[in-house]
A protein has these predicted regions:
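Conserved adenylate-forming
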Residues: 68-72, 195-208, 213-256, 268, ...
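AMP-dependent adenylate-forming
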Residues: 3-7, 27-50
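Conserved AMP-binding/adenylation subdomain of ANL enzymes
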Residues: 234-254, 264-302, 317
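Conserved beta-loop-beta connector loops within the AMP-binding
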Residues: 358, 377, 391-409, 428, ...
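AMP-binding/adenylate-forming catalytic core of the ANL superfamily
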Residues: 87, 108, 115, 125-131, ...
Length: 570
């Protein structure tokens, strides 16, 4: 296949990168700790640890896992917490010990946590005690699970007095720690102390060794563990580092990371910035907008990552306009489509465009991105990054013509080895010649830029015509009185499906008729919403901030006064 996008590559970005420059993520970490020893590596809540401290602390945790717990190469170790300084210490400790990281969403319910621990076969788990009660219920239900438990408190990486005050406030003032009781628990601080006095066995890791079991698909069925090897992750770090190299300087950058490290988007971005010696500032709870904005004011951050809903929330926050953004070079977005109105507002306020990128858990996750040189919202996801192939295939597996919609498929060294213990599911997502089926519908233009029209499963079919929810949502979001919107398909006897929109208004003055009039200016008749439902509460989202269309689509019908067929006469 012809890589037509290479004709439009920025001059400073190579077509291929050396994906074999490092044998493993352990080697990436070691090199950064040597090069940037005294620079801050990770920061959180006003405290930070240097690369030297990250090296020492992760070594101690690795030694504890090997010697005190007796875990072996390839054993799975779960990490269940929000963004805290303990996270990178534990993560790199697990990898240095030759073991596999299983990132766990701390908001998981008992059944969700139960599934992930049993499916992964986790031998140990590090959990923030705020969520230990959930783990307790899983262990009580399944006494056969022999999982070693390490607990930590929010302030465990802070100086002694601040740690004491923080932990007391979290537990007794804010009452954020439900009662829990688990036998034979080790505290994180004790684990580090134990490891400090023990020798670390050097594990010779290679590209084929598994680094992460990254669970995905929980919103559409039973979550599956994507097997991400050290080779996958090293490749993606190298690819993305090459993509940003022209704009960023080694040892001089500060990344604002408000997205959780247990999500692969934030995880890999953090690894990329760790490679170049940046200061990774971790935000524990970006939903606390006042505290978030206060934290923004403390740093001269040069790069940030986010999703559409986060950027919009910042723009709507009263204090954001006072934040000094003169040092910002890059605002990257992924996880969901960036709406035109959000991108335009962000550029107007900050002077920096939102650079939209695309990937999946199964691609570690980076696969396609807009170049950093864009000046405004492009409406597409950009070009394949170095050493990556992308194509649009029809249902028979043939490449579509330029501009013709099909399924976006990807090949490259960052593509997962498969799903953990799911050969049947693995077979479903790969073509016979090695393409990963992304499940996203889209097309490639004559410049080699890709545009997503929508998720294959989210597509709405109206009388045989394909309607893409992203387009509907983008149009509705342009209305100044719309806070949030989701478009889904609703059953209809005549047309099979009709477009339904669920809207959160900024003001009750917004009527169905006004919204329909707005839509008619931008949408052809069959794309017009035939059902408009107004809600007062925020729309359901993943922890990354992505609206859960499936949950809205499957929700029981509301009472007539809450959901009306407003467009019946359209």
């Amino acid at each position: 296949m012809e890589k037509i996008w290479l004709k439009n590559y920025p001059n400073d970005i190579p077509a291929e990168v050396d994906v074999h420059a490092f044998a493993s993520l352990k080697h990436v970490l070691q090199r950064s700790c040597e090069r940037f020893a005294d620079l801050p590596a990770y920061g959180n809540m006003g405290e930070s640890i240097s690369y030297t401290q990250l090296d020492r602390l992760s070594r101690d945790f690795a030694a504890y896992l090997q010697k005190s717990l007796g875990l072996r190469r390839g054993d799975r170790v779960a990490i269940m917490m929000p963004n805290l300084l303990q996270y990178p210490v534990a993560l790199f400790g697990v990898l240095r010990a030759g073991m596999v990281v299983v990132n766990v969403n701390p908001q998981y319910t008992v059944p969700e946590l139960e599934h992930q621990l049993r499916d992964s076969g986790a031998a140990a788990i590090l959990v923030l005690e705020n969520f230990a009660h959930t783990l307790q219920q899983v262990l009580e239900k399944h006494p056969e699970l022999k999982i070693r438990v390490i607990t930590t408190q929010v302030g465990d990486m802070f100086p002694a007095l601040k740690a004491l005050l923080t932990n007391l406030a979290v537990k007794y003032v804010k009452k954020m720690v439900p009662a829990w009781r688990i036998a034979d628990v080790t505290e994180f601080k004790d684990a580090l102390r134990a490891g400090r006095g023990q020798a670390l066995e050097d594990v010779a890791l290679q590209h084929e060794d598994i680094a992460f079991l990254q669970y995905t698909g929980g919103t559409t069925g039973v979550a599956k563990g994507a097997v991400l090897t050290h080779g996958n992750m090293v490749a993606n770090v190298q690819q993305l580092a090459a993509w940003i190299a022209h704009d960023l300087l080694d040892g001089k950058e500060t990344l604002l990371c408000p997205l959780p490290l247990y999500h692969v988007y934030a995880l890999t971005c953090s690894l990329v910035f760790m490679k170049i010696g940046a200061h990774n500032v971790l935000i524990t709870n970006p939903r606390d907008m006042d505290a978030f904005i206060e934290e923004l004011g403390k740093h001269r951050f040069t790069a940030m990552i986010g999703v559409n809903t986060l950027y919009r929330a910042l723009l709507d926050a009263p204090g954001f306009a006072r934040v000094d953004l003169h040092s910002l070079k890059i605002a990257n977005a992924g996880g969901m489509a960036v709406q035109r109105i959000v991108a335009q507002r962000w550029k107007a306020v900050t002077g920096v465009p939102i650079v939209e990128a695309y990937g999946l858990t199964e691609t570690s996750p980076g696969a396609i991105s807009n170049p950093l040189s864009i000046e405004d919202w492009t409406g597409n996801i950009g070009m394949p990054i170095p050493s990556t192939q992308a194509a649009v295939l029809d249902e028979e597996g043939n490449e579509t013509a330029i501009g013709e919609v099909g399924e976006i498929c990807v090949r490259g060294p960052q593509v997962m080895a498969g799903y953990w213990n799911r050969p049947d599911e693995t077979e479903k997502v790969f073509t016979s010649d090695g393409w990963l089926r992304t499940g996203d519908m889209g097309f490639m233009d004559e410049r080699g830029h890709f545009k997503i029209t929508d998720r294959k499963k989210d597509m709405i079919i109206v009388s045989g015509f394909k309607v893409f929810p992203n387009q509907i949502e983008d149009v509705v979001a342009l209305h100044p009185d719309v806070e949030e919107v989701a478009a889904v398909g609703a059953h209809d006897e005549r047309s099979g499906e009709v477009v339904k929109i669920i809207v959160v208004r900024k003001t009750l003055a917004l009527t169905e008729q006004a919204l329909l009039a707005h839509c008619r200016l931008h949408l052809t008749d069959y794309k017009l919403p035939k059902i408009i439902e107004f809600r007062t509460e925020p729309l359901p989202k993943t922890n990354l901030g992505k609206i859960l269309r499936r949950e809205l689509r499957d929700a029981p019908k509301r009472e007539p006064q809450e959901a009306r067929a407003a467009a019946a006469t359209a």
